[in-house]
From Swiss-Prot:
NCBIfam families: PRK05256.1
Compartments (UniProt record): Cytoplasm, Nucleoid
Pfam families documented for this protein: MukE
Residue spans of biased composition, Acidic residues class: 221-234
Keywords, sorted A to Z: Cell cycle, Cell division, Chromosome partition, Cytoplasm, DNA condensation
Statement: the UniProt record of this protein carries the keyword Cell division: yes
Entry's family note: Belongs to the MukE family.
Protein name: Chromosome partition protein MukE
Natural source organism: Escherichia coli (strain K12)
Record GO cellular component, one term: condensin complex
Highest classification ranks of the organism: Bacteria, Pseudomonadati, Pseudomonadota, Gammaproteobacteria, Enterobacterales
Function: Involved in chromosome condensation, segregation and cell cycle progression. May participate in facilitating chromosome segregation by condensation DNA from both sides of a centrally located replisome during cell division. Probably acts via its interaction with MukB and MukF.
One GO term of the biological process aspect: chromosome condensation
Amino acid sequence: MSSTNIEQVMPVKLAQALANPLFPALDSALRSGRHIGLDELDNHAFLMDFQEYLEEFYARYNVELIRAPEGFFYLRPRSTTLIPRSVLSELDMMVGKILCYLYLSPERLANEGIFTQQELYDELLTLADEAKLLKLVNNRSTGSDVDRQKLQEKVRSSLNRLRRLGMVWFMGHDSSKFRITESVFRFGADVRAGDDPREAQRRLIRDGEAMPIENHLQLNDETEENQPDSGEEE
């Protein structure tokens, strides 16, 4: 088929994007709900180069390729999406809000951007209602040590799920330490110009405010075990 005929079917730039060796794995990651930030240099540069054409490509599946103000990319499904999806749990989203709060904190710079799972858990208990958190784990929770242990395990699971979405990077093979990416702004408060974003995020957490429906994070329906384990740093 001549190049002229190809252009009648699809733009040459889109054909180049689909033929690029980066595309298959990147496409799979985006469809799984992963956010692609500046840390993923090659993938991010690829999306920057072909954004206009890939937006048209994904529109055929009734999803939008979004570039957030912070620079990261993700797919936002419409109600008629052809890509399977599921919504994050309430605890997953609460952990995401805490991560966003930590991202905005002075401690991020002091710690070179590295936090521990224990720091995440402690901040969660400081800012959120512990009784409500325990109810997310066990609706009949009495506040026992067993329930608290289960909550901590669930928080670890939520953190790992958010890692698979590109929200955090584990430090090498040490899953107890992680670095937060700008993608956590998916969980950020919508603040007016002049507001303190960290204080707005604190209110969002304490008030238990739900995220707007259009900002709900979507996952595909595959199990975590089937997801690529790519969220690590050396």
